[in-house]
Amino acid sequence: MKNKSQYQLNPLTKAFAAALPVVMMATCVPSAQANTLFIQNHWVRDYLDFGQNKGVFKPGAVGVTIQRKDGTSFKLPDLPLPDFSVAEVHGAAASLGNGYGLTVRHNNLTGGSIARPQYGHSIYQKVDHMLVNGGKEDIAYLRYNKFVVESTGYGEGANFNLSHEQALDRYGTDYQGKRRILIYRVGNGSVNLVKDDKKHGFLGAYNRDFQSAGIYELRGNWGSGDFDDIVGSSFVNEVTSGDSGSISLVYDNYQKKWVVFGTTAFLVGNNYNTWYRATKFDNAAMQQFKDKWSKNVALNGGTLSFNEKADAYQINGNAEVAFRGDKDQTKNTNDKDLIFTGGGTLRVNRDLDLGSGGLIFADDKKYTVDSYGFDQEGPFSVSGAGINAGAGSVVDWNVSGVKGKNMHQIGTGTVNYNRKQNNQLRIGNGTAVLNAERTFDLVYLANGLGTVKLGHEKALNEDGNMNNLIFTERGGTLDVNGHSLSFKRIATNIHLGIIKL
């Protein structure tokens, strides 16, 4: 691979370069590089499949080997591949799970794909963000109006309090004869192609069809945030203008999972070369942000009811506890996620709108959400960011939804929808049991981890040719549970869903 500083930017590339800052370490200014795919030995498709988890690059796959153009083999590190569905489709932000996201501060935080991010085929809205150290750190934590169903997200960061030796043990990998800390990154920066030492401008930034990924190694000591291409590797995807906010990950050998290294922020240079810098993920800052947007509720088998304004609750008739703040300077109400533990009942005696707040039900307990009485059209409704049903938990949902306000379900637990909801279900994980006639107007399965089980012979909306059932972004499983079902067409994206009889 050639020294990156020898490639000169053409006028189009220079225009894109303004989107990614360059930190100069010397007076001699090197050229900032674009998202450059080295195609002397590898096909463009390999980089795209890697970044989109297609073909052999499935999440969790280990020991992946691909063929170079000359017929020789290139073996990826012996690490389970990350799930790159965390990337927003334009690449400038990433999901951290539930209703949280991550980007850099210098991106436009009030417009574009940061204010209205898209994951899969769902468009979300940013309702808040938090800067770190008075905005001196080039990182921003995001709060969305709904739980993201297209990805489980990566919500934990690496530990930057470790020494370099400790980090090498915890996050290091033996690769090509050397112990290294490898960093995996996915983004949608502007695309250049390099072949025969010539660079060709190809495509502008933020094209969802050209999401690509690369493998890098830590540069310098742990904690610097710096990383670079692996010397001598043929599979090279240089960071580009337009890659600001793209997520970078490291593998935690202790926890056997991927954690966030940071968000890609800068090109850094000296007289001889350029490399990359991520703003390090701050676990304490993220927890502070979550604390602002969540409320722990020890239900412990009790019965909870909400007050008339839906800004406070009481358990078993005891004193009210406030959980929603006043509107702030952005005019957004502090709509907290309610995190329930211990099992129990939520009693709803009026239509309840939680805004951007969701309901999180902790593991291995039974919960019931009841409509206490009925209005003229049926049970009272509940709307908000969605439901997160924890592992082993079961939620009996005996209320209705609100037309135009979709239900987003995540978590590995089970939700029994026992009433007609009048809206759409978007499920990314866990099991949804549809026990009412036409339980939802439309069902959208994403991420490949969710199961929709039919508990009623007419649970789906049978208007049209496709039963208003969509498999998208890795799809999911439809368990017909012994019921008869006929399709004229099945709506699916690239990855097919599974129909279980």
Model-based region annotation:
Residues I139, R143-E238, G242:
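Chymotrypsin/trypsin-fold serine protease catalytic domain
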Residues G413, R426-N435, A446-G450:
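Glycine- and acidic-residue-biased ligand/ion/polar-headgroup-sensing regions
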Residues F38-F50, G111-Y171, K195:
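Conserved catalytic-core segment of clan PA serine endopeptidases
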Residues M1-Q33:
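Gram-negative bacterial Sec-dependent N-terminal signal peptides
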Residues H106-T110, N145-E150, N188-N192, N253-Q255, ...:
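Acidic glycine-/aspartate-rich tracts in secreted/extracellular proteins
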Residues N334-K336, F340-R419, H456-L501:
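Extracellular, surface-exposed repeat architectures
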Residues N35-K69, D83-S85, G91-N108, N207-S233, ...:
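C-terminal subregion of chymotrypsin/trypsin-like serine protease catalytic domains
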Residues K4-Q6, G269, Q287, D291-S381, ...:
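Solvent-exposed adhesion/ligand-recognition segments of exported proteins
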